[in-house]
Amino acid sequence: MAKVRVYELAKELGLSSKQLLGKLNDMGEFVRSASSTIEAPVVRRLRDQIGSAEPADDAKAAKPAARKSQTSSKKTSKETTTAKPAPGPKPGPGPKPTPGPRPGSSSGPKPGRSSAARTSATPRPGLIKSSGASSQQEPPAAKPESKPTPKPGQNVPKPHAPAPKPKPGAPSKSPKPGARPGPRPGGSAGLPSAARPGPRPGAGRRTGAPRPGNNPFASSQGMGQSRHRSEGGQRSGGSRSGQGERMPRPGGSQGSRGGSGMPRPNPAMMPKHQSSQIGQATTGRGGRGGGRGRGGSRGSGFGGGFGGGPRGPIGGGRGGRGGRGTQGAFGRGGGGRRGRKSRKQRRQEFDEMQAPLVGGVRVRKGNGETVRLRRGASLTDLAEKINAEPAQLVQVLFNLGEMVTATQSVSDDTLEILGGELNYQIQVVSPEDEDRELLESFDLEFGEDEGDDSDLVARPPVVTVMGHVDHGKTKLLDALRHTDVVKGEAGGITQAIGAYQVQTEVDDAERAITFIDTPGHEAFTAMRARGAQSTDIAVLVVAADDGVMPQTVEALNHAKAADVPIVVAVNKIDKPEADPDKVRGQLTEYGLVPEEYGGDTMFVNVSARTHEGLDDLLEAIVLTADAALDLRANPDMAAQGVAIEAHLDKGRGPVATALIQRGTLHIGDSIVAGSSYGRVRAMINDQGESVDEAAPATPVQVLGLTSVPGAGDNFLVVDDDRKARQIAEKREARMRAAQQARSSRRKTLDQLFEQLEKGETEELLLILKGDGAGSVEALEDALAKIDVGDEVDLRVIDRGVGAITETNVSLAAASNAVIVGFNVRPTAHAQRMADEENVDIRYYSVIYDAIDEIEAALRGMLKPIYEEKAMGTAEIRQIFRSSKVGTIAGCMITDGTIRRHAKARLVRDGVVVQETEINTLQREKDAVTEVREGYECGLTLTNYSDIHVGDEVQCYEMVEKPRD
């Protein structure tokens, strides 16, 4: 509802704008002009004050007003339509009113409201009350059906219409603010909205009535809208009439169900104004009237359904169940619905609904199902498998103490912990199974020969030479091949895997044997494992002078794990200290029993230097292959094999040393090797000769790949380059995720808090570049095993094969990393850029040199540990005062040396009084830097002067302690 302006209200109340402004100022309300608007509470107070102060006359009684009469009387006229429905009647007759209105009267009609405009019955639906309109006289209550229907033309004000006399003995009712009338039952339909009369000029508002159209909970808003309520009529005697007027209940007795369903009393139910306008309180409690509506204003009691009063028509309402009234601008409406929740309850329910759950979010848990995930899978991959949201899984892991993003690769242990929390069995697919599933999606298969037995032909055996470092493996192969590979190896040790083919004559037949040379250093464990998996027979080389060494046992275990037969070559028998029988006895403890001892393992004594026993070794290899193995393959199928080594050649690009296991590789074939793919441009055998094809068990160097494959990657020939590229890209994505999950050292919340307490952790970042993929892999694995404590961390941020490029230098400059070059050098532009950016590049040709220097660098990054070292002691024998330097201690040096600016502590009676330092030191009149034992001196302490005779000054220094 719009706000009322001053001049409109003045016109309505019959005052001038100036008078109304004065009254507003007297009330303490500041209003600027007559065009200003007034808030609804001020309008209400103003109307109450003017209504109680001004006398009522006949002219004002004819004007429409919002106040109700406090007298209850039996109406003989019907209510006419107004802009707002009249309040429903409440039972109980009122006292007899006087014919003329008197100001301040408690029983007569009020000013501004004609007593003839009141009825004793509940208003009918559709009828709209018009204040000041002449009410037609109604027949007696015994004949309610003869009551005429009002017409629009009857809405003419009749100020002096006599009010009918009420029934004697009926008590008057007190007004109840906010009461809303129910529609009169049995009445005709209301006028259309266009035909409804507007507000009467000069009409005042009802005292205490809520403003219509301002109730947010009302089903209908606006002035003059009627509500269809249940029918209620007067009760005459014991009879009830459906559409007639009901007689008020005599004697003020309680109406039916007077107290049932009533709301709890609250301050809104109390009368707003205690003035002469308020009539007498009822002596009894009436029932709730008006059906669903309110039967009228309440009296001083709280029963509800009271009749009469200044805000309701005279007469009793139906003593039945009432509904809630419409809430106005100030105060609550009628009785609330049953089960209505308080604001506190609603707030509590809302808080409980929004409160976080203890222990994590709600995620659908499984029933122990098995979920297969690839290695390095993310939480998004797991969420797709179990039909959950990735954000929920992130929250679950956070509650478990792990901080992981939705797309970050997760380690296997973390996935298993998360699966156990959600009641799922997480099964991490092995790389072999994952690669098999990938190839099956392209209708490919690796590892099986195609065709039947008639398509299989004999192939040479593949022999891997294994053993401890410096036991003569490469020298033995040089003797077999009549070459000198050892001379070209840095440090005299093999740091790359190599493949060669040797021709030998066995039983007057030329036989080919393929040898694979593996490194013996402990850093090349992965290479030895790959060599054992790619071989048919393992030759275990043991030096006769050293015996069984750690890498000998490791190579033995690799061969047993690959389930390949083993031939033992006892080397260096030409040395005087050689003891082949000792070697046989040691290997017997590991399950290798010689044939001469009743076992099944062939032992051959050889000397790579004198070529003694080489033919016996070749014969033993061939006999073992023929006796224990079925060495056949299909040469007509698409080639498949393994890349045992790979490197980046400056002139030829990526070069892979491949061992053909089945099929025949031709120039022009589309191949995919790990995450690399390409077309075979050229093939070179172990003698350096170009070949057009490679048969099974033949080692060749393959050129034409787009990148350097990983050492040990399987390769196979596919139909076209497109399929090869798709397989390579999928493998690369899988390897990247697995590498991230493996290399990322994720901290838990507890570890993070501990780190924050201790301070930042020093970290050494490395970029590894090598000449071969196997060498880089071996170097990275060896560096990962370095452990110097929790204060320093080592992390490899990039790795690659080939020369050091400008990209590597840029990354190192941006991340403050160190570049490690293993048998490689930077390009000219990269070297110039490294000099400009002050990037540190370290070059190594032997792997253990790199490991030792990097470990030393890590130890140098450790925070130093200091320990206290005593320097000397001085005894204070006399104290001097000086205005320049303060208190001077005259001392005798009793032990060691006292130096100026050295740390010192003042000790009194064996108790440390102060930690300070020597500020000044003087002997006689000369300032000195130190004073030795047996001499006197004068000294002052920094920021301390409370010294006594007999105190000791102990001088010391902090010396760095070397870290282990």
Curated annotation (Swiss-Prot):
Protein's gene: infB
User: What are the protein's GO molecular function terms?
Assistant: GTP binding; GTPase activity; translation initiation factor activity
Its taxonomic placement starts with:
Bacteria, Bacillati, Actinomycetota, Actinomycetes, Propionibacteriales
| Region feature G3, mapped onto this chain | 517-520
Bias (Pro residues) occurs at 86-102, 159-169
Cellular component, GO, one term:
cytosol
- Give the span(s) annotated as G5: 607-609
Kindly provide the name given to this protein in its UniProt entry.
Translation initiation factor IF-2
Gly residues biased stretches: 252-261, 284-334
Q: Residue ranges of region Disordered?
A: 49-357
Where along the chain is composition biased (Low complexity)?
62-85, 103-117, 190-212, 242-251
- The domain of life for this entry's organism is Bacteria
Keyword Protein biosynthesis attributed: yes
Described function: One of the essential components for the initiation of protein synthesis. Protects formylmethionyl-tRNA from spontaneous hydrolysis and promotes its binding to the 30S ribosomal subunits. Also involved in the hydrolysis of GTP during the formation of the 70S ribosomal complex.
**tr-type G domain mapped to chain residues:** 458-629
Q: Where is this region: G4?
A: 571-574
- Composition bias of kind Basic residues appears in 335-346
Q: List residues binding GTP.
A: 467-474, 517-521, 571-574
Q: Does the keyword Cytoplasm apply?
A: yes
Region G1: start and end of each range? 467-474
